[in-house]
Amino acid sequence: MIEHNPTTIYGTTIVTVRKDGKVVIAGDGQVSLGNTVMKGNARKVRRIGKGNVIAGFAGTTADAFTLLERLEAKLEQYPDQLMRASVELAKDWRTDRYLRKLEAMMLVADSKVTLALTGTGDVLEPEQGVMAIGSGGNYALAAARALIETDKSAEEIARKAMNIAADICIYTNHNIIVESLDAQ
């Protein structure tokens, strides 16, 4: 778990939902420095690779960008192989002294697979097609799990889960960015 430090940049909630031929990653736009909101419209969900992978990141911003860049390099090395690229990144993350100190997590998805890349170098797949990370991750995860068996679309579930997390978590706001892909 990331420890709270008043001089560290925190925040964010990222959620992913895979349902009915769609995969969605949604995230809020808040960046906090200690207990102060520094920015409300940061973009923490984006397309990477050749646009066929979506990623959302939580944790300290510089660390998250470092990992995102490393994942993009692995995707260039292993095109159209998100699982392989993620495992190779995790190997680096676990063995490189510099990378081991990074405080960030990512959710990544392509048409075939959704993965969480953790700060300990784990690569995890969701059990029920939903996963969430970040300061409001537990709230978003609970909301998404409650909604996954309804007739709502993947995007509707992700947006509702993010709004619930933003209502509860002080490090999450309602400025929600959503990226989606067709899924197999």
Curated annotation (Swiss-Prot):
<dbReference type="InterPro" id="IPR001353">
    <property type="entry name" value="Proteasome_sua/b"/>
</dbReference>
<dbReference type="GO" id="GO:0046872">
    <property type="term" value="F:metal ion binding"/>
</dbReference>
<keyword id="KW-0021">Allosteric enzyme</keyword>
<protein>
    <recommendedName>
        <fullName>ATP-dependent protease subunit HslV</fullName>
        <ecNumber>3.4.25.2</ecNumber>
    </recommendedName>
</protein>
<dbReference type="Pfam" id="PF00227">
    <property type="entry name" value="Proteasome"/>
</dbReference>
<comment type="function">
    <text>Protease subunit of a proteasome-like degradation complex believed to be a general protein degrading machinery.</text>
</comment>
<dbReference type="GO" id="GO:0009376">
    <property type="term" value="C:HslUV protease complex"/>
</dbReference>
<comment type="subunit">
    <text>A double ring-shaped homohexamer of HslV is capped on each side by a ring-shaped HslU homohexamer. The assembly of the HslU/HslV complex is dependent on binding of ATP.</text>
</comment>
<dbReference type="GO" id="GO:0004298">
    <property type="term" value="F:threonine-type endopeptidase activity"/>
</dbReference>
<keyword id="KW-0479">Metal-binding</keyword>
<comment type="similarity">
    <text>Belongs to the peptidase T1B family. HslV subfamily.</text>
</comment>
<feature type="binding site">
    <location>
        <position position="166"/>
    </location>
    <ligand>
        <name>Na(+)</name>
    </ligand>
</feature>
<dbReference type="InterPro" id="IPR029055">
    <property type="entry name" value="Ntn_hydrolases_N"/>
</dbReference>
<keyword id="KW-0378">Hydrolase</keyword>
<dbReference type="GO" id="GO:0051603">
    <property type="term" value="P:proteolysis involved in protein catabolic process"/>
</dbReference>
<feature type="binding site">
    <location>
        <position position="172"/>
    </location>
    <ligand>
        <name>Na(+)</name>
    </ligand>
</feature>
<feature type="active site">
    <location>
        <position position="12"/>
    </location>
</feature>
<keyword id="KW-0888">Threonine protease</keyword>
<keyword id="KW-0915">Sodium</keyword>
<dbReference type="InterPro" id="IPR023333">
    <property type="entry name" value="Proteasome_suB-type"/>
</dbReference>
<dbReference type="InterPro" id="IPR022281">
    <property type="entry name" value="ATP-dep_Prtase_HsIV_su"/>
</dbReference>
<dbReference type="GO" id="GO:0005839">
    <property type="term" value="C:proteasome core complex"/>
</dbReference>
<feature type="binding site">
    <location>
        <position position="169"/>
    </location>
    <ligand>
        <name>Na(+)</name>
    </ligand>
</feature>
<keyword id="KW-0963">Cytoplasm</keyword>
<keyword id="KW-0645">Protease</keyword>
